[in-house]
Amino acid sequence: MVAMSGGVDSSTAAALLKEAGYEVIGVTLALWPEDTPPPPGETGCCSLKAVDDARRVANILDIPYYVLNFRDLFEREVIDYFIASYLEGETPNPCIACNRRIKFGALLAKARALGIDYIATGHYARRWYDKEKGRYLLARGRDAGKDQSYALYTFTQEQLAHTLLPLGDYTKVEVREIAARYGLPVARKAESQEICFVTEGDYRDYIQSRAREKIKPGPILDTRGRVLGQHRGLPFYTIGQRKGLGLALGKPCFVVALDPERNAVIVGDKEDLERRVLYARDNNYILWGELPGKARVTARIRYRAPEAAATWHPLAGGRARLEFDEPQRAITPGQAVVYYQGDLVVGGGTIESVAQI
């Protein structure tokens, strides 16, 4: 079962699997809420155009195609989490939540219940079974510019055992060439960049439309606790933000922390964004069956952030402490931190808090 978004990547994944001899079924997930019109754009993974494109590709490949309704689950597991995170002063990653709960959670469970051996997606990452370790491993895709392993750190061993990632050994250029060779109409289709369920305006407008009564103004404080002004509500701010603060201090200032207990936005100088230590919750580990006492890793604190050398320490309750060799700028609670050793994904978690040392 191939999760088809109507884009070139998942379409090419379906084509490659059929060519390899698999019996392929294409599915598109209906995710947009009933009270929200489907995204109108050309590239959104949930848009009506996406469904049309996926169906056309399935017809060309001569594979069965279905649209599956995951609206209610998506609203509970992704949209509600997205809104709640911003209200709590965190910056969420809805794509990771969707991968964890929807694609490789509910969709995989449905496929297995139907007797289907694997689900497949168009992610740029590699997975294989390592006999020496007795584990399935996950690694970056060959195309460093398109690598999506960061968004896949939540894989369990059971999920990896029943997942195929056909594009891991290809570059984006090669994928488009393969799609063109198959005569797929999406071979030159632009990529989707937006949050799929935010159909109008930006994410702030979306949160306001769905949780206006929960957004409360509060104080803007400096790092010493002095009141500098008023903010419009925590969801309107994120770590590292400089514009839109409404302050005239005669010097640049940045959001350095969000304090939900005091409903406060904390601002400071650029140097105040630098931190060497983070704490992460809800960690998942792919490379390790048993956790070491500590380990050297490289870590990525945002999807497109460069990796940085660090020492990882396990903590109780699925938490971890990560100490970077050099200070990192704008480490943001709510975002994922993903640990690597070479090309291999060690695992990752959700950034909970930061510290200086």
From Swiss-Prot:
Site (Interaction with tRNA): H123, Q335
Single GO MF descriptor: tRNA-uridine 2-sulfurtransferase activity
Active site per database record: C98, C196
Chain's role: Catalyzes the 2-thiolation of uridine at the wobble position (U34) of tRNA, leading to the formation of s(2)U34.
Catalytic activity: S-sulfanyl-L-cysteinyl-[protein] + uridine(34) in tRNA + AH2 + ATP = 2-thiouridine(34) in tRNA + L-cysteinyl-[protein] + A + AMP + diphosphate + H(+)
PANTHER family in UniProt: MITOCHONDRIAL TRNA-SPECIFIC 2-THIOURIDYLASE 1, TRNA 5-METHYLAMINOMETHYL-2-THIOURIDYLATE -METHYLTRANSFERASE
Keywords on record: ATP-binding, Cytoplasm, Disulfide bond, Nucleotide-binding, RNA-binding, Transferase, tRNA processing, tRNA-binding
Primary localisation category: cytoplasm
Compartments, record wording: Cytoplasm
Broad EC category: transferase
Biological source species: Moorella thermoacetica (strain ATCC 39073 / JCM 9320)
GO aspect biological process, one term: tRNA wobble position uridine thiolation
Binding site residues for ATP: A3, M4, S5, G6, G7, V8, D9, S10, L29, G122
Family: Belongs to the MnmA/TRMU family.
A GO cellular-component term linked to this record: cytoplasm
Protein's recorded name: tRNA-specific 2-thiouridylase MnmA
Gene3D superfamilies: Adenine nucleotide alpha hydrolases-like domains, HUPs, Translation factors
EC number, UniProt record: 2.8.1.13
HAMAP family for the chain: tRNA_thiouridyl_MnmA
Chain intervals for the UniProt region annotation (Interaction with tRNA): 146-148, 302-303
Disulfide bonds: C98-C196
